[in-house]
Amino acid sequence: QAKMLCCAPSLSTHNPGATLKVAKRNERMRSAGGHLHLAVGSTFHGPAGADKKPTDNPDTIRFVNLLDILVGLPSVLLDRDPNAAKRRRVYGRAGEHRLPPHGVEYRTLSNFWLRNYILMSFVFGQARQAYNIWGSSKPHAKGYDIDYLPVTVNFDFYADLLKRVDMKSVARAINRNDLDLAWKLWDKVSEFTTEFNPHQGNGVNAST
């Protein structure tokens, strides 16, 4: 088992019901991941499967898709290691995640972002924005009207974002480390994030 690359299998939002296992004993390449552990509780945990572990639910799919768009996609722009695409043939593919007791583990990133504080801040900020978009896509109270009654916002920001970017294209850009495709998609994501939160910005542009 020590010769195997990776440990427990991952779940995939791009291939629901499948588990991703890595590794042949004779595979000589090894790589380090930079996984994001998000303490968001059991909101994203569906019913336990045959292995008594939680399965994905609709909220899981939405949240991990948002992480692919806002965290995984810009990682293609920032991490230009030529081995990234090779690594993702077997490990760290788009939509890879686990559901630990504390919430969600996003397993797509390499450890490139751990090299300095600026990159760490960017990744954490993008993950936070993904969570904010997920939460804002549900009906929620936002302020009060003139009669002090709650004003409910019922606009699906997630659905609006997916009208602008195709998830299959996002997965392709991540899995192939396709810089040109990633830039085309990121331009559309940037338009959305600027509208969603004009004070935060998108964090990555051609001069970054």
Regions found by a protein language model. Name each.
Residues 1-208:
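Phosphate/nucleotide-binding catalytic core
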